[in-house]
From Swiss-Prot:
Reaction(s) catalysed by this chain's protein: GTP + H2O = GDP + phosphate + H(+)
Effect of substituting G95A: In NS8; results in increased ELK1 transcriptional activation
Basic residues compositional bias, start-end: 197-219
Broad class of the protein's primary localization: membrane
Protein name stated in the entry: GTP-binding protein Rit1
Family: Belongs to the small GTPase superfamily. Ras family.
Family matches, as InterPro entries: P-loop_NTPase, Small_GTP-bd, Small_GTPase, Small_GTPase_Ras-type
Result for mutant: T53S: Loss of interaction with AFDN, RLF and RALGDS
Region called Disordered, residue ranges: 193-219
Miscellaneous remark of the record: Stimulation of the NGF and EGF receptor signaling pathways results in rapid and prolonged activation. Shows rapid uncatalyzed guanine nucleotide dissociation rates, which are much faster than those of most Ras subfamily members.
GO cellular component term of the entry, any: plasma membrane
Functional summary from the UniProt entry: Plays a crucial role in coupling NGF stimulation to the activation of both EPHB2 and MAPK14 signaling pathways and in NGF-dependent neuronal differentiation. Involved in ELK1 transactivation through the Ras-MAPK signaling cascade that mediates a wide variety of cellular functions, including cell proliferation, survival, and differentiation.
C-alpha cells in the first residue's frame, strides 16, 4: 500500500528551515522485520537478506497531512537489554515503533520489555509509540491474533497496525501515524502551557469582587 512516500530530494522537499525533523526509533526482537519495514518505507524495496544485529540510520523527506517532515529513522538491533548506546537513542528519539511478528509469540511477549525500556529511560508513559504486528501475509503461520495486538495497543494507548513488509501493506501508515502522534502530543503540551500561564477567570473574579462591592456601595 503506497500512500505517497518519496525519498529525499523529491518534489516534496520544502524550503530550507521550514521542515521539522522527527527522530524515530524502530524497536523489536530480531527477525521481526524492522529493517524490511524501514527499507520498504524509504526505498520501496524488500531486502532479501539482512543482518539483524546491524543498526542502521535512514533519512527521508516527505509530506504528512500537507506538512513537510524530515524523518531520521534509527533501525536498531533486536536485543532488549539495556546499554549505554541504547540509553542515548532512547533519550534522543521522539517516537518509537515497537514491532513483533505475528508468526512469533515470543516476539509479541518481548514488546512489553521494549515498552518498559522506553519508560526506564524517559520516565513517562506519554512518549509517542506505534505498535506493529508484522508479517501479516503469513496467515498460515500466525501465532498472535489481531485481537491480542489490539488489546495490547489499548493498554499502551497507542495506534496499532498489522503490516506486511514483503508486500508493503500499511507500511507508510505506520510511520505517518507516529509523526501524527508526535505532532498531537506537542500541540497538547503547548495548549497545556498556555492554559497554565493564563490566570483563571474564576480566581480573577474572586479577587475583583470586593472592589466591585465597594464601588456599588459608593454609588
Amino acid at each position: 500500500m503506497d500512500s505517497g512516500t518519496r525519498p529525499v530530494g523529491s518534489c516534496c522537499s520544502s524550503p530550507a528551515g521550514l521542515s521539522r525533523e522527527y527522530k524515530l526509533v524502530m524497536l523489536g526482537a530480531g527477525g521481526v522485520g524492522k529493517s524490511a519495514m524501514t527499507m520498504q518505507f524509504i526505498s520501496h524495496r524488500f531486502p532479501e537478506d539482512h543482518d539483524p544485529t546491524i543498526e542502521d540510520a535512514y533519512k527521508i523527506r516527505i509530506r504528512i497531512d500537507d506538512e513537510p517532515a524530515n524523518l531520521d529513522i534509527l533501525d536498531t538491533a533486536g536485543q532488549a537489554e539495556f546499554t549505554a548506546m541504547r540509553d542515548q537513542y532512547m533519550r534522543a528519539g521522539e517516537g518509537f515503533i515497537i514491532c513483533y511478528s505475528i508468526t512469533d509469540r515470543r516476539s509479541f511477549h518481548e514488546v512489553r520489555e521494549f515498552k518498559q525500556l522506553i519508560y526506564r529511560v524517559r520516565r513517562t508513559d506519554d512518549t509517542p509509540v506505534v505498535l506493529v504486528g508484522n508479517k501479516s501475509d503469513l496467515k498460515q503461520l500466525r501465532q498472535v491474533t489481531k485481537e491480542e495486538g489490539l488489546a495490547l495497543a489499548r493498554e499502551f494507548s497507542c495506534p496499532f497496525f498489522e503490516t506486511s513488509a514483503a508486500y508493503r501493506y500499511y507500511i507508510d501508515d505506520v510511520f505517518h501515524a507516529l509523526v501524527r502522534e508526535i505532532r498531537r502530543k506537542e500541540k497538547e503540551a503547548v495548549l497545556a502551557m498556555e492554559k497554565k500561564s493564563k490566570p483563571k477567570n474564576s480566581v480573577w473574579k474572586r479577587l475583583k469582587s470586593p472592589f466591585r462591592k465597594k464601588k456599588d456601595s459608593v454609588t
